[in-house]
């Protein structure tokens, strides 16, 4: 590994190898001093598609600027969660303060915000963009522009950020920097020569990138003498100190002596600590215009410090809140139930704490006849659901079942009343006039060889083609309108398998459309099991019924009487499977003898089975629920 020391020599950068055990000669004290000059601050984030090397480039910046010594360095330094490190993805946006002596000889302060790349976590990206003036658009020099790159680029342009285009991984043998530089230039309207080339792995080009950020990204603008205003762009919960909020100061100064005021709730709190992160927390006592840091407001209730809120002071309160952040809307709903019913209060507490770290998670209590007490949770997508469930199980030691995910439907009855359905058990039983389902605008980027296979897949999912653009001779962008319910489960998996892993997908909500949807119930012994009910398109109802009854026949243990498993739409049965009865051999003791004796025993057994069938109840074991409701089909939504 090579690290670049910007202070050594006069004619450019000197390369230091890891074998030379020298530490970089950058003083870390001055950049932590409070009251930095706003003209010397640059706030920027790194946006890219998943796996294009954001976190590796961030690591190299930490090393080059000297805030992390070479001996303490580890890969993906800013990815602190175990899940992030295991899956190799960034889930939480992280921020860090970097000192940098630019090529003009002046010392600057850079605030880097490392953002996630996965489609489910684009709300984390939008929060980060609201705290920045510039964005480094990172593209893998071996893979080129992908769907999420474009989605995040459009987000950055909407926020009026200065774009610094960069090609990463130029050290790879498969890299094609010239080809992809032209692609980027065509999209953002610059010259191919303005696209920087770096390698996050070796450190090549990183000092030049930092100099370019200083040159291109504008300094933050704000009123240093006005009432304090700071936007909360993230928050975490600490069991000892309560809520820790990450803020970007827009006007005025926040100090530890002031009482802070949350503008959306009008609640005031004592400020316990104010500081910056570089990359560990350093208390500074104050934050002024343009600075990014943390404030500990001494709040224990997680709902008191909402992400997107504006912090001001009680001494000189601001009158207007800061804009630039919208609440994320849940796209997918699923029930989360503790396997042990006594863990319900612990699950409530865990969701409360997790919601502080995860502004997009919504939940409300619900009960199920089959699964007991639990919560109906709203998520941004299937990966988001999986990550939340995994964090609940790991960080809070809970054992959970999640029901099959579904989306929000709007049902209009014949008397013109409207019902919002987030759970199949809420589906109305009366006369339904119309049902509306949410749709999304999907953007798919893929090689031209696979256009036919992908169009066939989208049409099979009730998609409507809206547009087709050739980015180059071998890459095409397809725009489709698709029902959200069709893509949340296994669409991503099917897309990857049909394109040998080359396609990428991004989508955003696009309203709703009229649809022919029905509720399919699963009946055991004539009784509905609410946990297995699902809302599906009428054309796919039969397939769902057959697959669910077949699955349950394998999973439910045999009883002493025959158990019918049926799938029904209303009162009409559409599929049926039987679980054969276990039969005791009542003739085992009869050695020969009269046939009437045997017949008498068989008739007696038949009577018993008949009586058992009328009064017997079928208990569905916990394992059968877990297996039948497992979201394994959604797992490939993870990279």
UniProtKB/Swiss-Prot annotation:
GO CC annotation: plasma membrane
InterPro entries named among the record's database cross-references: EF-4, EFG_III/V, EFG_V-like, EFTu-like_2, G_TR_CS, LepA_C_sf, LepA_CTD, LepA_IV
GO biological process: positive regulation of translation
Organism: Frankia casuarinae (strain DSM 45818 / CECT 9043 / HFP020203 / CcI3)
Compartment(s) where it occurs, according to its Swiss-Prot or TrEMBL record: Cell membrane
The keyword Ligase appears for this protein: no
Protein name listed in UniProt: Elongation factor 4
Catalytic activity: GTP + H2O = GDP + phosphate + H(+)
Function recorded in the entry: Required for accurate and efficient protein synthesis under certain stress conditions. May act as a fidelity factor of the translation reaction, by catalyzing a one-codon backward translocation of tRNAs on improperly translocated ribosomes. Back-translocation proceeds from a post-translocation (POST) complex to a pre-translocation (PRE) complex, thus giving elongation factor G a second chance to translocate the tRNAs correctly. Binds to ribosomes in a GTP-dependent manner.
Membrane topology: Peripheral membrane protein
PANTHER family, alphabetized: TRANSLATION FACTOR GUF1 HOMOLOG, CHLOROPLASTIC, TRANSLATION FACTOR GUF1-RELATED
A GO MF label: GTP binding
One protein family per Pfam: EFG_C
């Amino acid at each position: 590994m090579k690290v670049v020391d910007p202070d050594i020599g006069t004619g450019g950068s000197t390369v230091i190898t890891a074998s030379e055990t020298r530490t970089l000669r950058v003083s870390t004290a001055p950049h932590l001093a409070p009251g930095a000059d706003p003209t010397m601050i640059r706030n920027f984030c790194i946006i890219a598609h998943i796996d294009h090397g954001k976190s590796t480039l961030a690591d190299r910046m930490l090393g080059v600027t000297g805030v992390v010594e070479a001996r303490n360095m580890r890969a993906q330094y800013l990815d602190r969660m175990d899940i992030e490190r295991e899956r190799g993805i960034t889930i939480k946006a992280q921020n860090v303060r970097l000192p940098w002596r630019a090529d003009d000889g002046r010392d600057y302060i850079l605030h880097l915000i490392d953002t996630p790349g996965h489609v489910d976590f684009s709300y984390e990206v939008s929060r980060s963009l609201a705290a920045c003036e510039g964005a480094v658009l990172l593209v893998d020099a071996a893979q080129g522009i992908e769907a999420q790159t474009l989605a995040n680029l459009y987000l950055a342009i909407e926020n009026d950020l200065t774009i610094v285009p960069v090609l990463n991984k130029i050290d790879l043998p498969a890299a094609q920097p010239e080809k992809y530089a032209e692609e980027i230039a065509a999209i953002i309207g610059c010259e191919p020569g303005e696209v920087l080339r770096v390698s996050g792995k070796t450190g090549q080009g990183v000092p030049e990138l930092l100099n370019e950020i200083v040159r291109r990204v504008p300094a933050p603008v704000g009123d240093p003498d006005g009432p304090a205003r700071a936007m909360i762009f993230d928050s975490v919960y600490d069991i000892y100190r309560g809520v820790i909020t990450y803020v970007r100061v827009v006007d005025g100064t926040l100090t530890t002596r002031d009482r802070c005021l949350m503008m959306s709730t009008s609640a005031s709190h004592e400020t316990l600590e104010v500081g910056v992160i570089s990359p560990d927390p350093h208390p500074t006592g104050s934050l002024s215009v343009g600075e990014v840091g943390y404030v500990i407001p001494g709040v224990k209730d997680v709902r008191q410090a909402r992400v997107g809120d504006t912090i001001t002071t009680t001494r000189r309160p601001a009158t207007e809140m800061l804009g630039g952040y919208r609440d994320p809307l849940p796209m997918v709903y699923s029930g989360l139930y503790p396997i042990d019913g006594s863990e319900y209060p612990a699950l409530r507490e865990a969701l409360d704490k997790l919601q502080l770290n995860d502004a997009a998670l919504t939940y409300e209590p619900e009960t199920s006849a089959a699964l007991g007490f639990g919560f109906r949770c709203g998520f941004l997508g299937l990966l988001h659901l999986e990550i939340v469930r995994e964090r609940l199980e790991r960080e809070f030691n809970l054992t959970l079942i999640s029901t099959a995910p579904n989306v929000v439907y709007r049902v209009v009855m014949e008397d013109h009343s409207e019902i919002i359905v987030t759970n199949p058990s809420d589906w109305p039983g009366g006369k339904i006039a119309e049902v509306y389902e949410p749709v999304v605008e999907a953007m798919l980027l893929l090689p031209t060889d696979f256009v036919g296979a992908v169009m066939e897949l989208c049409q099979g999912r009730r998609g409507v083609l809206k547009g087709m653009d050739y980015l180059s001779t071998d890459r095409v962008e397809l725009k489709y309108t698709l029902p959200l319910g069709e893509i949340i489960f296994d669409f991503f998996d099917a897309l990857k398998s049909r394109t040998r892993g080359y396609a990428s997908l991004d989508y955003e909500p696009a309203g709703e459309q009229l649809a022919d949807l029905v509720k399919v119930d699963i009946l055991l012994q004539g009784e509905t099991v609410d946990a297995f009910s699902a809302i599906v398109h009428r054309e796919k109802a039969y397939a769902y019924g057959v697959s669910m009854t077949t699955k349950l026949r394998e999973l439910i243990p045999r009883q002493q009487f025959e158990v019918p498993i049926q799938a029904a739409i209303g009162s009409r049965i559409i599929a049926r499977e039987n679980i054969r009865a276990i039969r005791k051999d009542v003739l085992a003791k009869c050695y020969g003898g009269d046939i009437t004796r045997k017949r008498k025993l068989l008739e007696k057994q038949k009577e018993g089975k008949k009586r058992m069938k009328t009064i017997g109840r079928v208990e569905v074991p916990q394992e059968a629920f877990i297996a039948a409701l497992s979201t394994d089909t959604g797992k490939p939504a993870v990279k």
